[in-house]
Amino acid sequence: MAGALAAGATLPRTALARQAIEIMWEDLIPPGVPYSEIIGEGVMDERNDLWLPEFDENAKKLNPVLDGAYIKMPGFIIPIETSTEGVTSFVLVPYVGACIHTPPPPPNQLVFVTTATPWPGDDLWEAVWVTGKMGHEITSTEVAETGYALAAEEMEIYIW
């Protein structure tokens, strides 16, 4: 399905509720907004040898097709809340180390995920598939601001 959403295709809500639509990270950006228009030139933090991106108003623009959609997408876990059983909320990020070892991607490239079934803490470096209902919701966390929220119903290790 990746690419079809980016091209602006619309899907009937009834179809979204029956089967998860597999999406990729580029599908989070609304049609007609190139990624290059989200991230500005940024600045170099010479002291820490780190490039700090600058985002414009496009960084919070979300894909309207995804609001309320039942989706499946891959990503990496940045834990926010944990219990003795595992991670109960996290930021789903497009690459390992996002928000921790590198500056965070723009809000429309980050998903705040909650799950009723905790994800084991020993699998945090593995890519995962997350399936559930996606929504538009700006959430500020200690690691980054997210543009999407996802109520996870299913999670599994992403097999490369």
Stretch-by-stretch model annotation:
Residues 15-160:
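OB-fold and OB-like single-stranded nucleic-acid-recognition modules
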Residues 1-17:
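N-terminal export signals
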